[in-house]
Amino acid sequence: MSGNTSSLSYKDAGVDIDAGNALVDRIKGAVKRTRRPEVMGGIGGFGALCELPTKYKEPVLVSGTDGVGTKLRLALDLKKHDTIGIDLVAMCVNDLIVQGGEPLFFLDYYATGKLDVDTAADVVSGIAEGCVQAGCALIGGETAEMPGMYEGDDYDVAGFCVGVVEKADIIDGTKVAAGDALIAVGSSGPHSNGYSLIRKVLEVSGADKSEELEGRTIGEHLLEPTKIYIKSALKMIAEHDIHAISHITGGGFWENIPRVLPEGTKAVIDGKSWEWPAIFNWLQEKGNVETFEMYRTFNCGVGLVVALPKDQADAAVELLKAEGENAWVIGEIANAEAGEEQVEIK
């Protein structure tokens, strides 16, 4: 037996159970706002229970998981944590809508070296706000305090979402055909992708994040939360014959649009059909980034690209605008030769 007679505790090792309990108490109100009628029980159990909505005849579950990448570093640098949770939810639920999925519930994972209750509460409150916007329930999560794994105030977050879609209504891209119109749904900014390049542009250019651009600081532009499209997109899906939806995330236009196109087709994008939001022009200028690289890294103002019959395009655009979205016809689907690129921007 060791000669040391002092008694060690978990707190001595850097894990504060009391802080974790305080966090749970702080977030209960925010979590309650997200509740759906299908949820069974409250937070704090080992597992969370959720029934399937009764309106679905042949329900198929659709799931997704994601993080917010190095946008988190900007949030840490600027000490602004109340919107990063919205980003986390958006990155998951916007992937579900690609297949027509209605988000049901969301779980989060928050990891840090030393738990700061105020910071964590801000993050979880943002997650709850994102869930409210998406119409899904925040039914559980994990807060991991891991001394020695994270430096200083650093933390990381991950999210997991489950949704449901009617089997007969799954959107899988198989109906996409030459002559289909392409609709763009506007983004709120860079969303949660391309931030390693953004941070490199800031570093190389020596730009000040407090510099103003169109009445807001660069930091505010860059931390603008990712837009959640669920409610407007579900309404569009209910009223129109949607052939495919692409969520423009990491890899930009070149990587994401081909993921929903069948072989032998390509998306022909009219690059003159919209003006990039100012933050993208600023990034391109400050970083001397080539246009091809911009489209391969950022959404350049386009959060979703939707394929549908040409004769429904105008009505779908008007529906989206009525729902508060910025939407426009951005191009069309054409036939593609074997080996030809599936995205062409004119």
Curated annotation (Swiss-Prot):
GO cellular component terms, semicolon-separated: cytosol
Query: Where is this protein chiefly located?
Result: cytoplasm
The record's CDD domains line, in alphabetical order, gives: PurM
One GO MF term: ATP binding
Location in the cell: Cytoplasm
User: What Pfam families does the annotation carry?
Assistant: AIRS, AIRS_C
Q: Keywords in UniProt for this one?
A: ATP-binding, Cytoplasm, Ligase, Nucleotide-binding, Purine biosynthesis
* Pathway listed: Purine metabolism; IMP biosynthesis via de novo pathway; 5-amino-1-(5-phospho-D-ribosyl)imidazole from N(2)-formyl-N(1)-(5-phospho-D-ribosyl)glycinamide: step 2/2
Q: Look up the EC number in the record and give it.
A: 6.3.3.1
* Reactions the enzyme catalyzes: 2-formamido-N(1)-(5-O-phospho-beta-D-ribosyl)acetamidine + ATP = 5-amino-1-(5-phospho-beta-D-ribosyl)imidazole + ADP + phosphate + H(+)
According to its UniProt entry, the protein's GO biological process terms are: 'de novo' IMP biosynthetic process; adenine biosynthetic process
Which top class of enzyme applies to this chain?
Answer: ligase
PANTHER family per UniProt: TRIFUNCTIONAL PURINE BIOSYNTHETIC PROTEIN ADENOSINE-3, TRIFUNCTIONAL PURINE BIOSYNTHETIC PROTEIN ADENOSINE-3-RELATED
Q: Which family does it belong to?
A: Belongs to the AIR synthase family.
Name by which UniProt lists this protein: Phosphoribosylformylglycinamidine cyclo-ligase
Q: Which gene encodes it?
A: purM
